[in-house]
């Protein structure tokens, strides 16, 4: 869905997001720019409960810039997990860094990144969190 960020942008583009969530087997949100859009997450979480869905997904880390470090990844994932996100979808993993992609942001979570081999620390944290967190 587009423009799910605020209630006013939803009204202009969708009418409302809640009815749309009913059609999804796994409702989801899109959290770009590292913003904390609590209303969007709470709406989706409410739809998950109302429609008896198994979880909620979120596309995250998009447009966060190249200096978005592990702390940012953990902080952004933690608040979303607290609001019911059970499936995290990384915004980008580039197959190549040729052309304009080398200036793309966020930094790709793929083998080109120097910290790629350390990234399982973040993913393991969220795997444990989702195992312990009630659905």
Region annotations inferred by a language model:
Residues 1-135:
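Carbohydrate-binding surfaces of carbohydrate-active enzymes
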């Amino acid at each position: 869905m587009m423009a799910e960020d605020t209630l006013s942008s939803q009204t202009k583009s969708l009418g409302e997001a809640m009815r749309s969530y009913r059609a999804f087997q796994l409702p989801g949100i899109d959290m770009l720019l590292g913003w904390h859009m609590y209303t969007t997450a709470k709406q989706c979480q409410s739809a998950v409960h109302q429609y008896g869905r198994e979880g909620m997904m979120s596309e995250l880390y998009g447009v966060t810039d190249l200096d978005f470090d592990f702390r940012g990844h953990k902080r952004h994932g933690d608040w979303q997990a607290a609001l019911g996100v059970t499936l995290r979808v990384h915004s980008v993993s580039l197959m190549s860094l040729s052309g304009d992609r080398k200036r793309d942001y966020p930094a790709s979570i793929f083998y080109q990144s120097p910290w790629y081999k350390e990234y399982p620390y973040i993913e393991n944290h969220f795997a444990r969190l989702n195992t312990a967190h009630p659905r």
